[in-house]
Amino acid sequence: MLFEQIAANKRKTVFIILGFFIFVLMVGAAIGIIVWNNYLNGLILAAVIGAFYILIMVMSSSSVVMAMNHAKEVTSKEQAPVLWDTVESMAMVAGIPMPKVYIVEDPSPNAFATGISPEKGAVAVTRGLLNKLERYELEGVIAHEISHIRNYDIRLSTIAIALVAVIAILSDIAMRMIFWGSITGGRNSRKSDNNNGGGAQAIIYIVALIFVILAPIIATAIQFALSRNREYLADASAVELTRNPDGLIQALQKISGDSKKMEEVSASSESIYFSSPLKSKKNKPGLFDSHPPISSRIERLENM
């Protein structure tokens, strides 16, 4: 059951990522139709901006994420021996280099990982998590975060965030060009085409315009669907490492029962946390939820 869940989650992730790239190209094609009356120009624009933006995002240092979330590095075992030992042992079991260790001075129990590869990984936990969890529960949470690093989830989420940003940029470019009348020549040629080809060209233009307007919303929903799926995969992978689903289940129950929201959370970092720092109590995932409900995560763990 465990390995079936892992395999199913990986397959779903592949489909979501492929769909995401296709969606970006579709947005580019729609913008090409709107701006130049030529979808190929839009495809090229989307590909160039997409590749450039992804490269910038992937090359960004994980230290930026840590700074945004006020995380301070633990540089020696003596500073936090239990945390250090737990990260070290879970990394060893996972077969990856030991990530850097950070602590966020916040009373709400939570954790996150960053780093685009296992060699550049880092794990951060809040002070509230260290104070609230027993060691075997902490192992479950750390195994979850180590799994994110081992499964290259941070790289995937970085690419997804970049693609959402690219779609927003492309949509904004199209809207500005339309608003400021920068495509007047294109409109004139389109009118000529409409006289020759009836209303088909106008219908294509309107459909493309609606698609571009809705694209950022759809892209955000796809990004969050990917995020929710990777959380399920990290849970299953954590059990693979610890061989103890009860530790992770108990940790999730304790975190769910804690009503304290994190005091300072970067909005762009919400999706990387172990559980939603906004403390959502919903039992069913919404389209724009970065995390699946804790009750759903516990149910899956209990069925392993």
UniProtKB/Swiss-Prot annotation:
* Membrane-crossing segments per the record: 14-34, 39-59, 159-179, 202-222
- Molecular function GO terms recorded: metalloendopeptidase activity; zinc ion binding
> Where are the catalytic residues?
E145
| Residues that coordinate or bind Zn(2+) | H144, H148, E231
| Alphabetical keyword list | Cell membrane, Hydrolase, Membrane, Metal-binding, Metalloprotease, Protease, Transmembrane, Transmembrane helix, Zinc
Show the GO cellular component annotation of the record.
plasma membrane
Positions the record marks as coiled coil are none
Q: Cellular location of this protein?
A: Cell membrane
Q: How does it sit in the membrane?
A: Multi-pass membrane protein
Required co-factor(s) are: Zn(2+)
| Record text on cofactor binding | Binds 1 zinc ion per subunit.
Keyword Iron included in the entry's annotation: no
Q: Does the keyword Transmembrane apply?
A: yes
- Lineage: superkingdom: Bacteria
PANTHER family xref list: PROTEASE HTPX
| Family stated for the protein in its record | Belongs to the peptidase M48B family.
Query: What is the protein name given in its UniProt record?
Result: Protease HtpX homolog
Origin species, per record, is Listeria monocytogenes serotype 4a (strain HCC23)
What's the encoding gene here?
A: htpX
